Each structure stands twice: as structure tokens, then as C-alpha cells.
A protein has these predicted regions:
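Non-catalytic accessory regions of SAM-dependent methyltransferases
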Residues: 1-126
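Conserved class I S-adenosyl-L-methionine
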Residues: 235-244
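Conserved SAM-binding loop of SAM-dependent methyltransferases across substrates and taxa
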Residues: 245-258
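Conserved SAM-binding motif I beta-strand of class I
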Residues: 259-264
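S-adenosyl-L-methionine
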Residues: 268-309
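Mobile active-site "lid"/loop adjacent to the S-adenosyl-L-methionine
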Residues: 307-337
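C-terminal catalytic and target-recognition region of SAM-dependent MTase-like enzymes
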Residues: 333, 347-409
Length: 409
């Protein structure tokens, strides 16, 4: 017998029940056995086991493979403004603690499921917030969440100049949501500012384009990994592949590298990287190449180009499990070429931002590339995304970024 609740009831499989009890907040479409009533797309439903035990309440999405995203397992919870105010309060308090006063001004404030706000990402660039809404349920309540963000940041003395929505990602279509981007307009927000803004990270100034830049404009998750690169760059000739707006390259240059070459296939990214180098007085020790890294690395190997530190920070080569074999080949190719380019004693920083390329598979790929390149690797550091992108240990999807720093021996 089901407990009386406030929302339409969804009964789920034993497998899904076990997953929820272990703390994973998703129920997939095939795991819903029965749905009472006709809840609106994106509305709240109560979730029950086959035996009628209440398991939680979450957003339902009829278009998505993730049919229900759990918000809370508290049977006494209400889901009005106070609920979302608490979630934002916890998220901001966590960032103030783990990022500290030097980095809180530019970090991820909300990381979806890891903050109990499924389908929502919010990044802060000084006084501009950039959001992505990736679930139908969050789309319905986003104004409540935005209002709380603006209100609570104002209480900290931070006046938000605008919220830019980067809802131009294909995953929204899987939720039945339109794609688009632009300033969010509301009576609690001023007239929108320019989408080009300035930030400072690790002592380096950047120009960030929140409208047209990759992701939300900048890769905040590599913040402390860039520090790791800067720490060992002194006196070295550095090749930064997939440089985007030059963040790893600039950290290497500021760290004392003799020479830094920044490579990206995008002419726009290269121009932005040059501007950032000029802004920081580092242009004289940097070179910039607009090229495909898969073509450039073999050419550099053939020329016996002189580098002793290579950085590989590619975009995600796969966004699905079924494409993982092709992605693995791509990762291995660039790592193999980098190892062939480097001398013994050289350094390699290599990354993957794909959740589907899990840590075990990534390490196996690196070891395979090392065998083929006839080198051994000494591990210096193994790192993850910065703590403003927290990993929930029972939600593996929140653990996505791998960063390894090796020396070739």
C-alpha cells in the first residue's frame, strides 16, 4: 500500500530502487513500471518501490531517457521557494569554503546533481552568471533558482549584472527543450551588460566571451591543474595543444617557461589567446599556431621539433558510451605522438574531460601509448576537476575530468 503523498505516483523496478537507495538520483525510462495520473512534463512525481515504500520526489521528463531526476528523499519535504533557497545557500557556502576568497569570484556555483539541483549548471564570472538548463523540470523552476542566486549573492555584497543562458547545447533537444542563448530578462536584474567580460585566475587576466566561447566561456574546472603546469614549466620549451583561449599556455609562460607554443584548430580561439597573452605581457615568449593537432603532432615528430613539455587538453572525443572505442583511438594517437616528440626526461600533461572515458580506461590508454612509444612514465600528479565541480562518490557521472602529469624516463 502506497503512502499518501502530494504528487502523482511513479512505481519503479527493484533495480532502480536499489540505485536510489545507494544515492544515485536518476530513474531511467525502462525502470518506471507504472505512473498514476497524467503529470505534466517537468512536474514533480513521488517515487515508490514495487512494495509501496516512498523513495523520493523528483522531476519527470517524458522525452528523456532519464525519466525521473530525484530532488529529495525526505518524505516531509516541500518544494516551494524555501526548498530552492536552501539548496542555493548550501551551494554558495560550499564554494566559499573550498574556493576561498581568492577564487570564489570566478567559479562554478551550481553543478547539477552534485548540488541537488538536477540539470542546472551556473558559472560565475565576477558579476556575470552563465547558466545551462538541461532538464525539463529545472526549466520550469529556473526563475525561482535565479532569483535566489541573485538575492543571496547580493547579501554577500555581490551585485549580479546579468544572467546569460547558454542553452545552445544538443542535449536540450533530448529533453524536448528548445536550443538558444541570450540574456535572461527579469525584474530583479538590471539591463544586460556586454557578453565580453574580464576575469583573473591564478594571477592571469583573461577576456571571456560568455556568448560565443566554448562551454560557458571558460574552462573553470582546470583552475588548479593549470597551477600544476605552471609549477614545473620554468626553463622549458612548452607545446600546449588544444589551447582554446591559452589558459594552460599562459600559466606555463607565467611559470617561467623559456618558450611556449599554443595550438588550436580554431582561428578565433588563437586570436583570443593572443589577446590574452598581450594583456598579460607574455606575448614575447609565445608562438601561436592555428592547426589540427592530429596533423601537427606527426609533422613535429618528423621535424624532430625541440620541446620538453607537452600539454594535451582535448575536447571530449565522445559524449556517449557507444562511441568510446573511436574516442580511445583518438586519445591514444595524440598521447603516442606527444611521447614520441618528447625526449627522455621530458614532461607530459594529459587530460580527458569525457565521463565515458573513465579513469581505468584512460590509464590503460596512456600505458598502451607508452608501450608503443617505447617509453616509461613516472607519475608526478594525478588530479581531477577543481572542487567547485564536486564529485558525488555514488554518482559516477559527476566524476569526469582526468589530469595526469608524467615525466618520460
Amino acid at each position: 500500500m502506497k503512502q499518501a503523498r502530494n504528487f502523482p505516483a511513479a512505481t519503479i523496478t527493484k533495480k532502480a530502487e536499489n540505485s536510489l537507495r545507494l544515492g544515485h538520483p536518476w530513474v531511467y525510462d525502462a525502470e518506471v513500471l507504472n505512473l498514476e495520473g497524467e503529470p505534466e512534463n517537468g512536474s514533480l512525481v513521488d517515487v515508490f518501490s514495487e512494495k509501496g515504500s516512498y523513495l523520493g520526489t523528483g522531476f519527470i521528463s517524458y522525452k528523456s531517457k532519464i525519466r525521473i531526476r530525484l530532488l529529495s528523499s525526505n518524505a516531509n519535504e516541500t518544494f516551494g521557494d524555501e526548498f530552492f533557497a536552501r539548496r542555493i545557500q548550501y551551494a554558495l557556502a560550499y564554494r566559499r569554503t573550498v574556493m576561498g576568497p581568492t577564487d570564489y569570484h570566478c567559479c562554478r556555483l551550481v553543478f547539477g546533481e552534485a548540488d541537488g539541483l538536477p540539470g542546472l549548471t551556473v558559472d560565475r564570472y565576477e558579476n556575470i552568471l552563465v547558466s545551462q538548463v538541461l532538464s525539463m523540470g529545472m526549466e520550469r523552476v529556473k526563475d525561482t533558482v535565479y532569483r535566489q542566486l541573485v538575492k543571496q549573492l547580493a547579501q554577500e555584497g555581490v551585485g549580479i549584472a546579468g544572467i546569460f543562458e547558454r542553452n545552445d547545447v544538443a542535449i536540450r533537444e533530448l529533453e524536448g527543450l528548445d536550443r538558444g542563448k541570450g540574456w535572461y530578462l527579469a525584474d530583479y536584474l538590471p539591463q544586460p551588460p556586454s557578453p565580453i567580460t574580464g576575469i583573473t585566475e591564478n594571477g592571469i587576466q583573461y577576456e571571456v566571451d560568455v556568448e560565443n566561447g566554448q562551454k560557458t566561456g571558460f574552462f573553470l574546472d582546470q583552475k588548479y591543474n593549470r597551477q600544476a603546469v605552471a609549477k614545473i614549466a620554468a626553463g622549458k620549451k612548452v607545446l600546449d595543444c588544444f589551447t582554446h583561449t591559452g589558459s594552460f599556455a599562459l600559466n606555463a609562460a607565467l611559470g617561467g617557461a623559456d618558450r611556449v607554443t599554443a595550438v588550436d584548430v580554431s582561428d578565433t580561439a588563437i586570436e583570443m589567446a593572443k589577446l590574452n597573452a598581450e594583456r598579460n605581457g607574455l606575448i614575447d615568449k609565445m608562438d601561436f599556431i592555428a592547426a589540427d593537432v592530429f596533423d601537427l603532432l606527426p609533422a613535429l615528430c618528423n621535424k624532430h621539433a625541440d620541446y620538453d613539455f607537452v600539454i594535451l587538453d582535448p575536447p571530449a572525443f565522445t559524449k556517449s558510451r557507444k562511441a568510446i572505442k573511436g574516442a580511445e583511438r583518438g586519445y591514444k594517437e595524440i598521447n603516442f605522438r606527444a611521447m614520441k616528440l618528447l625526449p627522455r626526461g621530458g614532461y607530459l600533461a594529459t587530460c580527458s574531460c569525457s565521463h565515458f572515458m573513465d579513469n581505468e580506461l584512460f590509464i590503460k590508454m596512456v600505458q598502451s601509448a607508452a608501450r608503443d612509444a617505447d617509453v616509461s612514465l613516472k607519475l608526478i600528479e594525478a588530479r581531477r576537476q577543481s572542487p567547485d565541480h564536486p564529485t558525488l562518490m555514488n554518482v559516477p557521472e559527476t566524476d569526469y575530468l582526468k589530469f595526469y602529469l608524467f615525466q618520460l624516463v
